[in-house]
Amino acid sequence: MTVLHSVDFFPSGKAPVAIEPRLPQAAFPEHHHDFHEIVIVEHGTGIHVFNGQPYTISGGTVCFVRDHDRHLYEHTDNLCLTNVLWRSPEAFQFLAGLEQLLPQEQDGYYPSHWRVNQSALQQVRQLVGLMERAGDGMDAPAVANREILFMQLLVLLRRSSLMEGATDNDAKLNQLMAWLEDHFAEEVCWEAVAEQFSLSLRTLHRQLKQHTGLTPQRYLNRLRLIKARHLLRHSDHSVTEIAYRCGFGDSNHFSTLFRREFNWSPRDIRQGRDAIPQ
């Protein structure tokens, strides 16, 4: 597995934060790093496989990667990221208690992926721009200024994330997409889902298409297929059982959609034929 080292990314041996744009981010094999990373998705779509679990990401997704997490990107489509790298809590001179603003693992579950709306994403861009222009002076005021900007970024992400509630349509859509991640295998009635999240059906269709480039049903199908591919690789369930577990009522229809999406059959995936030589 590829290991990325801080010496290759941070401007100096003492700098606690670095900015790494990926415009766009191509598919990238599984890797981990000796630093932490906040991945901010500007726009586009892709699959983020995080510690073996697949997540569909799009504009407004924020992922918090710890120094022991492993991840990769695949099936990227104009996926543009800004990566905010930071060494460790101990690397800061003026900041303490950062972990209170970061996702916390509880009972083995780590809520690594947050979502923010487009208004918050614009504020994030402005803050990252200030961080990039803050210079690399090592006197106390310069260091404190850079650390303050990083703290402001964490506060903004925390306040803007899904956990803080939603009022506008953009934020409601974020909640809906998070709901689909957990309920993808259920029979979905889009009229009922739109009502559940206080959106008109027309607004749901328009905004989901703007965020992902896909209609609601195609987005749901892709989500189901991604989950199915994970089970094919990491479980002993039969293809038919996996199809049903992932919301498909017909295994033949599932196999047709699967091949269309990934250019491999479920049996090919089960046998590891899609593995890319490293």
Swiss-Prot record:
PROSITE patterns noted in UniProt: HTH_ARAC_FAMILY_1, HTH_ARAC_FAMILY_2
CDD domains linked: cupin_RhaR_RhaS-like_N
Keywords assigned by UniProt, alphabetized: Activator, Cytoplasm, DNA-binding, Repeat, Rhamnose metabolism, Transcription, Transcription regulation
DNA-binding region: 191-212, 239-262
Compartment(s) where it occurs, according to its Swiss-Prot or TrEMBL record: Cytoplasm
Domain HTH araC/xylS-type: 174-272
Keyword Repeat: yes
Main location: cytoplasm
Membrane-spanning intervals of the chain: none
InterPro entries, alphabetized: AraC-bd, AraC_XylS_family_regulators, Homeodomain-like_sf, HTH-like, HTH_AraC, HTH_AraC-typ_CS, RhaR_RhaS-like_N, RmlC-like_jellyroll
Recorded GO CC terms: cytoplasm
Gene Ontology biological-process annotations: positive regulation of DNA-templated transcription; rhamnose metabolic process
Single GO molecular function: DNA-binding transcription factor activity
Pfam families, A to Z: AraC_binding (PF02311), HTH_18 (PF12833)
Top-level taxon: Bacteria
Site (Interaction with sigma-70): 241, 250
Self-association state and partner proteins as the record states: Binds DNA as a dimer.
Function: Activates expression of the rhaBAD and rhaT operons.
Stated name of the protein: HTH-type transcriptional activator RhaS
